[in-house]
Each structure stands twice: as structure tokens, then as C-alpha cells.
């Protein structure tokens, strides 16, 4: 298979600086890595943070962003096992980890202190060819629609793991804050497939319609509601058993603790800049509310999340555009005008 020496990609040289769609070198895989011809990549809010550099974690520079890449294995290092040329592979947020620390031993690889992150500390999937650690790369079944599966590799895995973390049972109410965005639209579907009743909170044109089309039961528009907490408690007959916070609003997180029912779990997923999680201690203790963070997922979570997708139980509402339009996508993200998930075609 002929592999070019240069490729199209989007790269920036300083955080918040210009995004260049240009010819860049094709990387060479290390002994433990795959070289993947990326066909499509989802665009995540994390990519926006990586570009801006507004998280308390330094990015590499220059940087090619992206961490929801779906493509074909075209080369591999000498130490790679379990893969062959032509396999479909996914590039995840967790590109690689040490596999030797306590967290890796417990299958919490995303919490590895030496984790290598796609599109952050490792050049990611906003290019036509990208490398990924063979252990962490996702096995995508043959025949899978690569554009459709791309968002599952981060957004899908992340919300699926968050729902597991909430430890609910079938028939319980889950409230999803940010229910019509890229993460939320998948969370609604995974929640339905897992047997939960779904209440969504979001605001803006078309969001209730999207939420209901995905199987959501009760929708609250925060731009119109005068009492979100009261409305959630009333609709769920006492409060949500679990809350999945995927919005990037500190106020939404604070409210979610108030409408979570006794012995329920509030799961923090979205990462608003400089946000604090504020909870009234008396209320939290007396109601025995759990507040936990959930950070992407491990290899088993990835396999399970992909299985839901391959069985037709979840379907990312995507809009496919060319990689060259990435700056415009970031602008829409900043304005909160994204419904579902943007996916970029690396050939355009």
C-alpha cells in the first residue's frame, strides 16, 4: 500500500492562534503504534479547549487536534499484535497510557498520570494520517459506516461510561443537562437503550424537537423555565435518580445537585472553564447525594459503547462537512449553535 509523505491537515502553532489547513508531513508509527488513514473525525468541545489552551493542562505545540478519528490501518510498528493492514480502527481521546501504574492495572487507563492524549499531547485526527497506540486504538467492525461511528469513539464512550457511573436501574429517571448537543444527543439514546426514563435540559432553537426525536420523554428549556429545579422534581416525582452533566455551565451543575433525589448520583462530565462544583453540605449529607466525576472510558467501555451502535440502538445525529471548514465549526461551538455532532471528511 502506497503511503504519501505529505497530507492535508489542520494545525495551529500557538494556542488561540490561526488554524491552518495545509500540507503537513505524514507521521511514522512507532514500534507500538498503528498508522491510520483517517477518513472521518468527529469534532468535540474538547478540541475547542485544546486550541484555546484554556485548560490547566498544557498542549503540545504545534498541534493537530481531533480525537474521534475513524479510518483504516495502513501501517504498523514491529511490536503490534492483534491488528492487520486493512482493519478499521478508531482513534480515541486516550491515545496511549503506561500500562504499568496502579490506575492502568485497575483498567482506569484514562487516569494514568502519563496518559498520552489524542489532539492534545499527541497529534490527533484532524489530518488524513494519524498514529495511535495499538493497545488503545478501537477495533471497529468491518462494514461499519465510518462517518457515523466517529462520534462514538469519544462522545459515545464518555456518556455511556457516565451512565454506568450513575449506577441506576431500569425505570429510573436520568436528567441530562445539555441534552441536545453532541454528547447529550448520544446520552439520550444510550439512556433509553439501558432502560432509563429520560428528562432533558437544554435551550435554543430545534433542541426540544431533536431531543424528542431521539426518544426523550420530558424536555425543559432553560431559556423559558422560571424554576428548573421545581420542574424537574415535579416531572420525575421526587427528583432524578441520576444526573449527567454534559453542558459547560457552572450554574447548571449547581442546579443539578438540587434536583437530584435522595441517594441519587450527580455525574460531572462537561468541563466549563474555571468552574467550581458548589454544593450545600447540609443538603448533600441529609439527602445522601453522590457527586462524582466521569472521564471518558476504558477499553471495555469502548467495546460496549460500539456494540450498542453496531446493533442500531444509538445513532449519532451528525452533519458531515469538509476538514477545511473546521474554523467555522469552532465559531458555531463558541456561539452554542451546534445541534448534534459535526463530523469532518478529511478528503475535503
UniProtKB/Swiss-Prot annotation:
Homotetramer. Keywords: Acetylation, Cytoplasm, Metal-binding, NAD, Oxidoreductase, Zinc. Zn(2+) 2 binds at residues 98, 101, 104, 112. Binds 2 Zn(2+) ions per subunit. Its cofactor is Zn(2+). Zn(2+) 1 binds at residues 44, 67, 154. Transmembrane segments: none annotated. This is Alcohol dehydrogenase 2. NAD(+) binds at residues 178-184, 202, 207, 269-271, 341. It comes from the Eukaryota. GO terms for molecular function: alcohol dehydrogenase (NAD+) activity; zinc ion binding. It comes from Kluyveromyces marxianus (Yeast). The keyword Oxidoreductase applies. Its EC number is 1.1.1.1.
Amino acid at each position: 500500500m502506497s503511503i504519501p509523505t505529505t497530507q492535508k491537515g489542520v494545525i495551529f502553532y500557538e494556542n488561540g492562534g490561526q488554524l491552518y489547513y495545509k500540507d503537513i508531513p505524514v507521521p511514522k508509527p512507532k514500534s507500538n503504534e498503528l498508522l491510520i488513514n483517517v477518513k472521518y473525525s468527529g469534532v468535540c468541545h474538547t478540541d475547542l479547549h485544546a486550541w484555546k489552551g484554556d485548560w490547566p493542562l498544557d498542549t503540545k505545540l504545534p498541534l493537530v487536534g481531533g480525537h474521534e478519528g475513524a479510518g483504516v490501518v495502513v501501517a504498523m510498528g514491529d511490536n503490534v499484535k492483534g491488528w492487520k493492514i486493512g482493519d478499521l480502527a478508531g482513534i480515541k481521546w486516550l491515545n496511549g497510557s503506561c500500562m504499568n501504574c496502579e490506575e492502568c492495572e485497575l483498567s482506569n487507563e484514562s487516569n494514568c498520570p502519563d496518559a498520552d492524549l489524542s489532539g492534545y499531547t499527541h497529534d490527533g485526527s484532524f489530518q488524513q494520517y494519524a498514529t495511535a497506540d495499538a493497545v488503545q486504538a478501537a477495533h471497529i467492525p468491518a462494514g461499519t459506516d465510518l462517518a457515523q461511528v466517529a462520534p462514538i469513539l469519544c462522545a459515545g464512550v464518555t456518556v455511556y461510561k457516565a451512565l454506568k457511573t450513575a449506577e441506576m436501574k431500569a425505570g429510573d429517571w436520568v436528567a441530562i443537562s445539555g441534552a441536545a448537543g453532541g454528547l447529550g444527543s448520544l446520552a439520550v439514546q444510550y439512556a433509553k437503550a439501558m432502560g432509563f426514563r429520560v428528562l432533558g435540559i437544554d435551550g435554543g432553537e430545534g433542541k426540544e424537537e431533536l431531543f424528542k426525536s431521539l426518544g426523550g420523554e420530558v424536555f425543559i428549556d432553560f431559556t423559558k423555565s422560571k424554576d428548573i429545579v421545581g420542574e424537574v422534581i415535579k416531572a420525575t416525582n421526587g427528583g432524578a435518580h441520576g444526573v449527567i452533566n454534559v453542558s459547560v455551565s457552572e450554574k447548571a451543575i449547581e442546579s443539578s445537585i438540587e434536583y437530584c433525589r435522595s441517594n441519587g448520583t450527580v455525574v460531572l462530565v462537561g468541563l466549563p472553564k474555571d468552574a467550581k462544583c458548589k454544593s450545600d453540605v447540609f443538603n448533600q449529607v441529609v439527602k445522601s447525594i453522590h457527586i462524582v466525576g466521569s472521564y471518558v472510558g476504558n477499553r471495555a467501555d469502548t467495546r460496549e459503547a460500539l456494540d450498542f451502535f453496531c446493533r442500531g440502538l444509538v445513532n449519532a445525529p451528525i452533519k458531515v462537512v469538509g476538514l477545511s471548514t473546521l474554523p467555522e465549526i469552532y465559531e458555531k461551538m463558541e456561539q452554542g449553535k451546534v445541534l448534534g455532532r459535526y463530523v469532518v471528511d478529511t478528503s475535503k
